[in-house]
C-alpha cells in the first residue's frame, strides 16, 4: 500500500469507537505516577493514552509508534524514546529484530498494550511482527495494562501474543455484554475497568 493509503487505514481505524478510545485513554493515565518509565504500544487506543498524558511529571516514555512519537514530540516534562526498527507497511509503527533487541535493554514500570482482539483464550493481533514487539514490551515491564475498546472482544485474529495471566488489568468501555463480563471475571480472572461512554449521536 502507498503511504497515503496506509495513513488512511490507520486514521480510519482510529475513528472507529473514538469516544470509547478517548475515555479509555483518560482512565489509563490515572495509573501513572510521577517519575515512571512507561512503554506505550502501537495502536489507535494507545494513541489516546499518549494524548491524555499529563504535561508534567518527569515521565520517560518508550514507544514503537511513529504516531505516538509525533504526538509526544516536544512535550514538556517528558523524555521520549523512539525504539528503532523497520517501518511496517500499512501502519505507522516499527517492528522487527532491531525493535525487539532495543526493548531488551530497557526495564519499564508500566506498559500499555493494545490489541486487535481478545477472548477467553487470550490476546491476539493480526501481525507476527507486532506480536513479537508486544511480547518483549510485556516481558520488560513490571506491570501490564491492556487498553482495548469493547468491539475487540470476541474478534478473530490469528496471532496470540499474551495469555490472561500476563495481563494485570484491562481497561475497556461499558459496551461489553453480560456474557463478556462473566468471561473476563470468571474465566480470564482479570481485573477490569469499564469506562462509561456516551453513545448518543
Task: Give each language-model segment a name.
Residues 58-59, 170:
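Conserved helix-loop-beta element of the AMP-binding
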Residues 66-201:
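Conserved phosphate- and dinucleotide-binding cores of soluble alpha/beta proteins
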Residues 18-22, 47-56, 83-90, 131-136:
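Short charge-dense sequence patches
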Residues 1-42, 50-58, 66, 73-77:
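HTH-adjacent hinge/linker in prokaryotic transcriptional regulators
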